[in-house]
A protein has these predicted regions:
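Conserved catalytic core of two-component sensor histidine kinases
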Residues: 56, 112, 142, 172, ...
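Axial heme c-ligation environment in periplasmic c-type cytochrome domains
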Residues: 72-78, 96-115, 122-133, 159-163, ...
Length: 215
């Protein structure tokens, strides 16, 4: 049994090596073309098909096969709402090194009543119907949130702090979800793919992702 398994592993390694030798030059050639061009120039359509296959193999488990994400911290990659920025270079950086996002819990600082006030104000930023009296009180407390999200609530891509004015919610935009976010905080982790895919394949995946919101 051990001999059979060992033989199978050796054969698998040989097949991987053969595939790499065959396709690595193709990925290297793609990597010489900037992400934006690779994503939008029709003559590079085959590269996007390859990028899509790599996406389905490595990214779809979290972001979905349609790349539209899901509640629970997995962002939609098909819109123009980017936590860290949507340039080709930024997408490559995200794929290479991953991201670690942390939203602190505010229950100790605000208390339950204070949380309720900030929730009302936060929801008002995207035009929602809210309790105006609570929202007015929440606006004062929001000063503590402005260090990351900005005084206008439009976020900060350098920090990965989301825009709170566009009604796009990573963990859900219901009053209950926003209350949970403020009460308990959030920790979002995007894994690094540098070792898994290598820079050339990452370049192709980034081009596919870029193409989804730049059609």
């Amino acid at each position: 049994q051990a001999s059979i398994e060992s033989g199978a592993l050796i054969q698998y390694d040989r097949e991987i090596k053969f595939a790499n030798e065959k396709f690595d030059p193709i990925f290297a050639a793609y990597a010489k073309i900037d992400v934006e061009t690779l994503a939008t120039d029709p003559q590079h359509a085959e590269a996007l098909k390859v990028g899509q296959r790599l996406f389905l193999q490595n990214c779809a488990q979290c972001h979905g096969s349609d790349a539209r994400g899901q509640n629970g911290g997995f962002p939609n990659l098909t819109d123009d709402d980017w936590l860290y920025g949507g340039s080709g270079a930024t997408i490559v950086k995200t794929l290479q090194g991953g991201r670690n996002a942390m939203m602190p819990a505010w229950l100790d600082a605000f208390g339950e009543d204070g949380i309720a006030e900030v929730v009302e104000y936060t929801l008002s930023l995207s035009g929602r119907q809210v309790d105006q009296e609570l929202a007015a009180k929440g606006k004062t407390r929001f000063m503590a949130c402005a260090a990351c999200h900005g005084m206008d609530g439009k976020g900060n891509q350098m920090m990965g702090a989301p825009n709170l004015t566009d009604n796009v919610w990573l963990y859900g935009g219901s009053k209950r979800s926003v209350t949970e976010t403020l009460t308990y905080g959030r920790n979002g982790v995007m894994p690094a793919f540098s070792k898994t895919l290598g820079d050339d394949k990452i370049h192709v995946v980034a081009s596919y992702i870029y193409s989804l919101s730049n059609k």
